[in-house]
């Protein structure tokens, strides 16, 4: 009599782990298929309200459409079916720089120019929220002019233009931020490295310096009320020059001498003509008569 056949029971750690591993692999494949070409790493790049949304990846088999909205508005589509990985949203965010904006990037498989057959609900990725007034970076300021006269140094910062409009006119950075915008001046003797600072909520500085010393300086835009992105990069460094100051003084001295000389000449000619005009009639009356 043959012995009964024993039932083969899977050993722990063999068939079950294989099943789990297979399920995990299928899940990873499904995830990869779902995310291939889908936009990610959405980033706002904004300076002085010039605002661009960037994302990844640079795909050859997907195109993208960007949508933007505020918290109370419907989505508005921009940059339709673009193969690029950036979209300029400046014209939308400058409408109200105090609003908070949200954007999302929809991903579509490329169709060689054929826009039919796209899914009604394509995969998309949301951006972080963006409030232009709080989140745009301050651009590098420019020193418009400077002059050192004696113990006074006057520095004027150029009022940068933005793409924010009011009544059809582009506003300056000062017009947008008002007194929230400060400038810090860093200045030092050209012969030393010890820096001093001055701050103003206008675009001009007038500071006391040592007479006869050259000074170097730079400026930086600051919004103290912000929690982040408070400061701009520093401007290019400018320096005064005693030679320039002396040349300016000589120019004014020479100009004054020329003006005085011209006045003397004009007065002399005028006096001469007046005397000649007076002497003419009297000379005729006193001349003897010619008797034939």
Curated annotation (Swiss-Prot):
Q: Which residues form a coiled coil?
A: none
Q: Which InterPro entries match?
A: FN3_dom (IPR003961), FN3_sf (IPR036116), Ig-like_fold (IPR013783), Interferon/interleukin_rcp_dom (IPR015373), Tissue_factor (IPR001187), Tissue_Factor_CS (IPR030472), Type-II_Cytokine-TF_Rcpt (IPR050650)
The alphabetical list of record keywords is: Blood coagulation, Disulfide bond, Glycoprotein, Hemostasis, Lipoprotein, Membrane, Palmitate, Repeat, Signal, Transmembrane, Transmembrane helix
| Tissues and organs where the protein is expressed, per its UniProt entry | Brain, heart.
Which positions make up the signal peptide? Answer: 1-32
| Membrane association type | Single-pass type I membrane protein
User: Any ranges marked Extracellular in the topology annotation, and which?
Assistant: 33-250
Checking PROSITE patterns in the record gives: TISSUE_FACTOR
Among the record's GO biological process terms, what is one? Answer: positive regulation of endothelial cell apoptotic process
Instruction: Spell out where the chain is glycosylated.
Output: 41, 114, 154, 167, 182
**Could you list the residue ranges that cross the membrane?**
251-271
Q: Give residue ranges for domain Fibronectin type-III.
A: 35-126, 148-240
Q: List the disulfide bonds.
A: 79-87, 216-239
**Got a GO cellular component term for this one?**
cell surface
What is the predominant subcellular site recorded for this chain?
Answer: membrane
Motif WKS motif per record, residues = 44-46, 75-77
GO: which molecular function terms?
cytokine receptor activity; phospholipid binding
* Database matches in Gene3D superfamilies: Immunoglobulins (2.60.40.10)
Covalently lipidated residues, kind S-palmitoyl cysteine? 274
Q: Where in the cell is it found?
A: Membrane
Per the similarity annotation, which family is this?
Belongs to the tissue factor family.
Name of the featured protein: Tissue factor
Native source species: Oryctolagus cuniculus (Rabbit)
Give the lineage. Eukaryota, Metazoa, Chordata, Craniata, Vertebrata
């Amino acid at each position: 009599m043959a012995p009964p056949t024993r039932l083969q029971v899977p050993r722990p750690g063999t068939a079950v782990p294989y099943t789990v591993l297979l399920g995990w692999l299928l899940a990873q494949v499904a995830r990869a298929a779902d995310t291939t070409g889908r936009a990610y790493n959405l980033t706002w790049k904004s300076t002085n309200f010039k605002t661009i949304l960037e994302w990844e990846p640079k795909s050859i088999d997907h195109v993208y459409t960007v949508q933007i909205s505020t918290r109370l508005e419907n989505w508005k589509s921009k940059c339709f079916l673009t193969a690029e990985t950036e979209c300029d949203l400046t014209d939308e965010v400058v409408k109200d720089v105090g609003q908070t904006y949200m954007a999302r990037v929809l991903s579509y498989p490329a169709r060689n120019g054929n826009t039919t057959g796209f899914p009604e609900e394509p995969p998309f990725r949301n951006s972080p929220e963006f409030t232009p007034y709080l989140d745009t970076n301050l651009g590098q300021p420019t020193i418009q002019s400077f002059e050192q006269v004696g113990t006074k140094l006057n520095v004027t910062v150029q009022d940068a233009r933005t793409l924010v409009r009011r009544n059809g006119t582009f506003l300056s950075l000062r017009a947008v931020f008002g007194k929230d915008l400060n400038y810090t001046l860093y200045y030092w003797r050209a012969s030393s490295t010890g820096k001093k600072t001055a701050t103003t909520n206008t675009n001009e500085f007038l500071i006391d310096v040592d007479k006869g010393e050259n000074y170097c300086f730079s400026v930086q835009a600051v919004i103290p009320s912000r929690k982040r992105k408070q400061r701009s990069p520093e401007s290019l460094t400018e320096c005064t020059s005693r030679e320039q100051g002396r040349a300016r003084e000589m120019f004014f001295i020479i100009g004054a001498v020329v003006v005085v000389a011209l006045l003397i000449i004009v007065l002399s000619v005028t006096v001469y003509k007046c005397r000649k005009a007076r002497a003419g009639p009297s000379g005729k009356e006193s001349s003897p008569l010619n008797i034939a």
